From Swiss-Prot:
Residue pairs linked by disulfide bridges in the UniProt entry: 42-77, 73-130, 119-139
Pfam families registered for this protein in UniProt: PBP_GOBP
Its job: This major soluble protein in olfactory sensilla of male moths serves to solubilize the extremely hydrophobic pheromone molecules such as bombykol and to transport pheromone through the aqueous lymph to receptors located on olfactory cilia.
Family classification: Belongs to the PBP/GOBP family.
Name of the encoding gene: PBP
Gene3D superfamilies documented for this protein: Pheromone/general odorant binding protein domain
Protein name as annotated: Pheromone-binding protein 2
Length: 164
């Protein structure tokens, strides 16, 4: 049985963990919503079908597996437009700033960059750049879910409807 001090300490730890996850979910949500703003321009530029909208709308759903090559092409286009990647790969400085612009503190922003960097290193060296970026995105999604930072489907749907 816990004594009063142990119970208070346990409550403080639980609250601090909750508060660390909630803002991180907000950061990922805000980054995602801003990231997709250029989607129509990328679809037009690359002549991509509207079917990729479903992948973007459901991206953070744990049960949704993204397999469409065109979605990888769109992610690559959006990342380039936001200057998050260059010809040599992830642009760490710009990605760090992008996370901070969407509410991340230094620690969360660095963790996001580290996750993206780790995923870039972990994906197989595929010849097709769209498929490579798709694998990179799937890795990042899985890592964000492990941290419990993925925004809920309900929150994302409500935010997207609010933007329309």
């Amino acid at each position: 049985m816990m004594n009063h001090k142990e119970l208070v300490l346990f409550a403080v730890v639980c609250l601090s963990l909750y508060q660390a996850v909630e803002p991180s979910q907000d950061v990922v949500k805000d980054m995602s919503l801003n990231f997709r703003k250029g989607l129509d321009a990328c679809k037009k530029e690359l002549n991509l079908p509207d079917t990729i909208n479903s992948d973007f709308n459901r991206f953070w759903n744990d049960d949704h597996v993204v397999t469409n090559r065109d979605t990888g092409c769109a992610i690559m286009c959006l990342s380039s437009k936001l200057e998050l990647v260059s010809d040599t790969g992830l642009h760490h400085g710009n990605t760090l700033e992008y996370a901070k612009q969407h509410g991340a503190d230094d620690t969360v922003a660095q963790q996001i960059v580290d996750l993206l960097h780790s995923c870039a290193q972990a994906v197989p060296d595929l010849e097709d750049p769209c498929l490579k970026v798709l694998e990179w995105a799937k890795c990042f999604k899985a890592e964000i879910h492990k941290l419990n930072w993925a925004p809920s489907a309900e929150v994302m749907a409500a935010e997207m409807l609010a933007e329309v």
